[in-house]
Amino acid sequence: SEVGVLPEIPEEKIVKKWRLQPGKMLLVDLEKNKIISDEDLKDDLKRKHPYGGWLKSNQILLSDVPKEIGPMTPDEKSLLNLQKAFGYTQEDLKFFLEPMIKSGEDPIGSMGRDIPLAALSNKSRLLYDYFFQNFAQVTNPPIDPIREELVMSLVSFIGPRPNLLDLTSGGKQKRLEVDQPILTNTDLERIRRIENHLTGSFKTLTLSICYKKDKNTVDIDSIISSLCSKAEKAVSENDYNILILSDRSVDEDHIALPALLATGAVHHHLIKKGLRTDVGIVIETGEARRVHDICLLAGYGAEAINPYLSFYTLSNIISKSKINVLEDEASKKYIKALNKGMLKVMSKMGISTFQSYCGAQIFDAVGLSSNVVEKFFTGTATRIEGVNLKEIQSETEERHLNAFKNNFEYDNVLNIGGDLSFRLNGENHVWTPETIGMLQHAVRSADYSIFKKYSNKINNQTENFKSLRGLFKFKNINKPIHI
């Protein structure tokens, strides 16, 4: 792609000059001693099989499936309970969802993170917070998703996947195509009841990822194992080819498993049983609302995601605020913002299509025990130990209890959050009004003693808030090592 890499080649020996463009290829045929261009190469390949006919007979667009009536929107009290159960905060509404429906863009904040890691926080954290996105560490972006939009695609296929190496089985498996992986509540109902319109092509089964609240300790490991067994049986014995993992049945008596945990568990269980390519996985969850959440669900195997509670929350925001946006338009802008955010995340690793990103697991786990990672997020890098399954269960049940108990002081408001900026009763921060004021005082007065107080305060905070650096200590040994 670079001119001048091969210098001193006489012009009379050059037959043609061009650059290798994105999405294009060339073949050097050593037997025939010639270079085959992109156009000739693809012309030869496309004539070998009736690909167009296969697509026409087996590729089904979700937009062509008739609409179905979805569940009713919950009342305001029920909506608030659901938001609390799934860990929504006032910051989520004000700094994420509201800007999304105003601009259709993924909100951008300042750099820098001065809050504890999820595993070291004394606040209840969602499982998504224990994962960090990987990125290609190069000086220029691997892909520019804006200027190289031509090679970017969020198209997803739901259902069984054909063997890419077996060209004799073409046209035998139906594929359900969606132009992007975020499903509205109406779209999800289309998939749930797809047998009403496409007899014999797809069979959809909804598996609840909720479990009944019990006074005694619930064994969450056995609940996940039961969920995986149901998924395996549905595919291997009953020929279901679309599974919907749903937490819609959450209520005062039923607690939802973290959607990411359920997704990773079922995805890897089906892989181990050799059944994953026989079925598509769709997630119906009230927990996911941000780009990071959606990327994690997709990265651990979800071909499509329906963040139903986000859509209900958008409707509530519009009804209460002065935002002049219709409900349908707000949903479209929210989906647009999520899509742009996903393209940005994919491009950081040089991935251009959602189909390549789905199940790729391009994350590091930080603060999860190796047992949890090995069992439910197999193959994910984890550098330190951390919380186990019981602690994840405890935090989930704590949020559920706070959502449905009668607490008159905070009954009608969401938790303030405090991740993005310092708030009383919010998440701990290293940079607080006290430390910032102390630094300003030290600089303006040029008083070293005040600066020492400031530095001691910062150092104490890194230990108290348990940052990894703050926990680092040298170990004294009795026998020095000779160097």
Please place each PLM-identified region on the residue numbering.
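Flexible, glycine-rich loop/tail regions that form catalytic "lids" or insertion modules at the edges
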Residues: 1, 5-7, 15, 34-221, ...
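Loop/turn positions that initiate beta-strands
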Residues: 21-23, 28
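Short, ordered loop/turn segments at secondary-structure junctions
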Residues: 31, 248-250, 286, 302, ...
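Conserved short loop/turn motifs at secondary-structure junctions
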Residues: 116, 246-255, 280-287
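Alpha-helix-loop-beta-strand connector modules within alpha/beta enzyme cores
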Residues: 255-283, 333-340, 344
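Catalytic cores of alpha/beta
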Residues: 287-301
